[in-house]
């Protein structure tokens, strides 16, 4: 089993020449490779895409076999991938998914990091995060709009819809956390983001997600204070450890206007640098003595959360951004760790109730013009959604494409299938140079059970019921998505989430149009269904308005 290969540089093909037998198999091939593009992945030489150890394939041997199999896959065959390893090809039918993926799934009693890490070391499992192992990661852009929507809503609730002259304090500039600085600036606030690894600060500077870098609190605060005084938002990455810097900032009397965190606290061994340790020591010891690393990291997380609670008690709006740090702190003895809320129940759930979530697409041509043309089509089809238009304008101006050009925008039930059909028609007419793939994050309204994140504090107490993502995956398979994935542990770590993903290809054919209409209606409809079942009036009204047939819910 080979997991480190510094000689490999993976980039997807572009243009219209196929190396697989159809666009339905060329698409997953290119998107797998795109996940490992050096401008996309965090550690591509180790197959790590983002989120600690979220991988695209189990090892390099498995990667090679997946590539070989996708190239020979027939139009009526389906490839099965088990935790990053291709295990079977079976005859199905042309409207069935070409790939079915299951990553990191464990029987609940054994769903712990300790057991998973043992399997991982033996080469029997792979952590897929959410979009790493499901081959639809598009770089940091993939989380920017969701983060932006959260920060905008925080501004609405706490500062009369105006974040000018305000600043956000956070930590973590990995593949997900790296979206925070740009999202904050887009929302009108300055951002100070703490990050312990210089390489991550450098990557966010290089890709335009971060404006400045600093090495001391004083240096960072001087930049923040100047930007707030001028009401010209900018972002600064501060090199350091959040468990050390947050308590010190509180002690000094520094008070941000908003506070959150996106360190990779979901993975105590690979995701969080213990206080007082160097990065080199951390990397060396997590291979040699992972239990000691986890113990030290968890103790540091408790310190981190206590500091967040101190800021909250001082009047700073504080929110958990879904990395499970509160749970770790509670397990470490911080009894009131959950005193500050998660971002979904606090700010995002009304969107989920309408099936609104992170719709995304990528241009297989590799040509940015294809994305700009689809941006214009979104505006044309949704002329009254001025908030979305503003987002698309900002995205074009501020977001650098990583790997294949792609776009993220939050739209919901009734709009997703219209956009998919329109994109398919653009391919058919030759307005786009090649097909597009349409997918989403697993963080969506009907595709995840995560009691400390997406399904925290559900009205009916059904936070931990994971039937819903299973039903979502089954329905997307039956509806004809091009590839479907079912994962465990994404975002919040082992034992705390189950979630599903789907991707569908718009290749300009009539067959694709039929699949797109089914999948892109049914997928968000499961989110409305799930929230209607939990008793949310917004979801119940949406279900009635859209004519959903929910016999055990609407009666």
Swiss-Prot record:
GO terms for cellular component: cytoplasm. Binds 1 NAD(+) per subunit. Its cofactor is NAD(+). Its main location: cytoplasm. Keywords: Cytoplasm, Histidine metabolism, Lyase, NAD. It is found in: Cytoplasm. Pathway: Amino-acid degradation; L-histidine degradation into L-glutamate; N-formimidoyl-L-glutamate from L-histidine: step 2/3. Disulfide bonds: none annotated. It catalyses: 4-imidazolone-5-propanoate = trans-urocanate + H2O. It comes from the Bacteria. SUPFAM superfamilies: Urocanase (SSF111326). NAD(+) binds at residues 51-52, 129, 175-177, 195, 200, 241-242, 262-266, 272-273, 321, 491. The keyword Cytoplasm applies. The active site is at 409. One of its GO terms (biological process) is L-histidine catabolic process to glutamate and formamide. Its EC number is 4.2.1.49. One of its GO terms (molecular function) is urocanate hydratase activity. NCBIfam families: hutU (TIGR01228), PRK05414.1 (NF003820). Belongs to the urocanase family. Catalyzes the conversion of urocanate to 4-imidazolone-5-propionate. This is Urocanate hydratase. It comes from Rhizorhabdus wittichii (strain DSM 6014 / CCUG 31198 / JCM 15750 / NBRC 105917 / EY 4224 / RW1).
């Amino acid at each position: 089993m080979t997991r480190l290969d510094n000689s490999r540089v993976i980039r997807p093909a572009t243009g219209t020449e196929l190396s697989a037998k159809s666009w339905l198999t060329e698409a997953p091939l290119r998107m797998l490779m795109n996940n490992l593009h050096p401008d996309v992945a965090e550690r591509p030489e180790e197959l790590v895409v983002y989120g600690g150890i979220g991988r695209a394939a189990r090892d390099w041997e498995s990667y090679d076999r997946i590539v070989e199999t996708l190239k020979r896959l027939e139009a009526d065959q389906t490839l099965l991938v088990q935790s990053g390893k291709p295990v079977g090809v079976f005859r199905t039918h042309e409207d069935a998914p070409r790939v079915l993926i299951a990553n990191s799934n464990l029987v609940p009693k054994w769903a712990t990091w300790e057991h998973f890490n043992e399997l991982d070391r033996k080469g029997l499992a792979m952590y897929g995060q959410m979009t790493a192992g499901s081959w639809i990661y598009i770089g940091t852009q993939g989380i920017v709009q969701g983060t932006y929507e959260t920060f905008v809503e925080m501004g609405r609730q706490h500062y009369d819809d105006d974040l000018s002259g305000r600043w956000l304090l956070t930590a973590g500039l990995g593949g997900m956390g790296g979206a925070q600085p740009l999202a904050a600036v887009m929302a009108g606030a300055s951002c100070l983001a703490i990050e312990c690894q210089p390489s991550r600060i450098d990557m966010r500077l290089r890709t335009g997600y971060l404006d400045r870098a600093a090495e001391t609190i004083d240096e960072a605060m001087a930049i923040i204070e100047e930007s707030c005084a001028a009401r010209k938002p900018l972002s600064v990455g501060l090199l350091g450890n959040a468990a050390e810097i947050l308590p010190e900032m509180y002690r000094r009397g520094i008070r941000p206007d908003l506070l959150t965190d996106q360190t990779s606290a979901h993975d105590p061994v690979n995701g969080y640098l213990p206080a007082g340790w160097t990065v080199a020591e951390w990397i060396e010891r997590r291979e040699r003595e992972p239990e000691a690393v986890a113990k030290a990291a968890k103790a540091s997380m408790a310190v981190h959360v206590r500091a967040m609670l101190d800021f909250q008690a001082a009047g700073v709006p504080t929110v958990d951004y879904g990395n499970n740090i509160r749970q770790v702190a509670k397990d470490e003895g911080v009894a009131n760790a959950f005193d500050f809320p998660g971002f979904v129940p606090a700010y995002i759930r009304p969107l989920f109730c309408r099936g609104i979530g992170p719709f995304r697409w990528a241009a297989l041509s590799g040509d940015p013009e294809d994305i700009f043309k689809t941006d214009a089509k979104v505006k044309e089809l949704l002329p009254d959604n001025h908030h979305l238009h503003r987002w698309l304008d900002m995205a074009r101006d501020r977001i650098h494409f990583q790997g294949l050009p792609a776009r993220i925008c939050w739209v919901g039930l009734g709009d997703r299938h219209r956009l998919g059909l329109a994109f398919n028609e653009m391919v058919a007419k030759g307005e786009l140079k090649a097909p597009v793939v349409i997918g989403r994050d697993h963080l969506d309204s009907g595709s995840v059970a995560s009691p400390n994140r997406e399904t925290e504090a559900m009205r009916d107490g059904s936070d931990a019921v994971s039937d819903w993502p299973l039903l979502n995956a089954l329905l997307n398979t039956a509806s004809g998505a091009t590839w479907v994935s079912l994962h465990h542990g994404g975002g919040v770590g082992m034992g705390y989430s189950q979630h599903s993903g789907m991707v569908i290809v718009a290749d300009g054919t009539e067959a694709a149009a039929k699949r797109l209409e089914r999948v892109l209606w049914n997928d968000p409809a499961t989110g409305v269904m799930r929230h209607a079942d939990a008793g949310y009036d917004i979801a119940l009204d949406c279900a009635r308005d859209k004519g959903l047939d929910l016999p055990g819910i609407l009666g």
